[in-house]
Amino acid sequence: MKALKTLNPYFWKHRNLLFLGFLFIIASNFFIIYKVQFIGQAVDELAKTSKFGVNFKIIKNVLIFIGSSLLTGLFTFMMRQTIIVSSRKIEFELKNKIYTHYQEMSLTDYKKTTIGDLMNRLSEDVVAIRMYLGPGVMYIVNLFVLLVITSAKMLQTDWEMTLWSLLPAPILSLIIYKVSGVISKKSKIMQASQSAVSTFVTDTISGIRVVKFFAKEFYFLDNYDKKISDYKDKAINLARIEASFFTSILFVIGILNAGILYIGGQKYIDGEISIGTIANFFLYVNTLIWPFSLVGWITSVNQRAEASMQRVNEFLDMKSEIINTNFENYEIKGDIEFRNVSYIYPNTGIKALENVSFSIKSGESLAIMGKTGCGKTTIALLLCRLIDPTEGEILVDGKNLKEHNLYLYRQHIGYVPQESYLFSDTIENNIGFAIDTPNIDTIIKYAKIADVDKNIIEFKDQYHTMVGERGVMLSGGQKQRICIARALIKQPTILIFDDSLSALDSQTESNIINNINEEIKNKTIILITHRESSTERMDRILKL
């Protein structure tokens, strides 16, 4: 349970609520056991009574039993309201922590995993952890408290029968110890299979156009069937083990009841105890049946939580390579210099850049050309400091890029990526996304500069048109131009186009470049392109 120890700070943070919950557990179990003795007294009273009529002692015992049951219900409700609520709060905080960490992860970290796996850790794994934090902890403490109170009351009633009743405890402990390890291993295997299913479904939905273009629906259905069948088999295998665990515990408790009946019967015949005492012992033991029957479920919950916490910790333990060490405010002018910059992608070992050097002054423009795979996009990623160079250094305004305030610097960067990405929102919100307080007039202005306003006004809802997931409702050229408008509306100091005019015809491309030159003055512009015509208005050209 080493991984679950990382939850200790959360327990400490919510210690007051949890402590209150534990007090309610003690109170609830006290009244559960307290009322049992009155059943025994009522049984003994009935055994002594030989005629029908009102027996006030029996009525008194029944009323006390009912009152204790009401108090038990009240404290049980309060127990759940404190412990379960605290688990929900910790779940909320843990999800926020994971999501925040996802935001801080570098691109290199993202390439090590899949979106489906990331989503699974944020949803399914956190739910498994929350089940441990709430019901898991609550039932463990409840069982312990109930066992202590019940054992004390049983010892007070008859110590010999108590020892016989507790005799199976070592057997139960051995079963729990042996099976919990198996459940832990099977849980990890099942959760890995579940992540594989989530990843496959995410990839299929994201690439549904390609699937349909190539008429591969049945191929993907066949693959999905294999993956979901594998998950089903692993889940059923785990369920069988859990069911066997549950059955074993009930079997041991059944033997225990038979033992109480035999030993209690012998002692009653010998006149050592009353029939009410036997009734009390049956009630004491059967009070433990429900908590003990949950031991298998609790063990399963805890082992699943352990496996899930390990998976979550794998990501939380990742330290981003991109670290901000400067929090000052200052002006970014836009002078850029690459000094013998090399970059090797860590996941593949591919050398994208080797000893690249160039410089560009603030307000100048640079076109970068070269064959596919020569490292043009890598330069864009380095300039945005989404990755850091393997060798060499990048200077901005004469200072190493690593020494700049990362968040301030990125606020001065306008980046139009090679792959146009739009959020599932309106056109207005997608363009205005780049600034804090966008207004429609500003949005329209930059949509016109990006030469996309004429298309937007033809839509029924114009700027309020929903673009669909990843902009699926728009053409490739429309998505590119909306992304350009989104970058321009920031009025950035440094503007980077990463082959982001490729889906446009030459006339539209020319219109956009002319508009940018007219409307955006004294900005550093870097244009990555394959087209010779796109470089005509650039001050410099770098060929890789």
Regions found by a protein language model. Give the residues of each.
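A hydrophobic transmembrane-helix motif
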Residues: 36-40, 64, 68-71, 136-180, ...
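Conserved catalytic Walker-motif region of ABC-type ATPase nucleotide-binding domains
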Residues: 102, 224, 312, 338-340
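An intracellular "coupling" helix at the cytosolic face of ABC transporter transmembrane type-1 domains
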Residues: 104-108, 124-133, 137, 182-199, ...
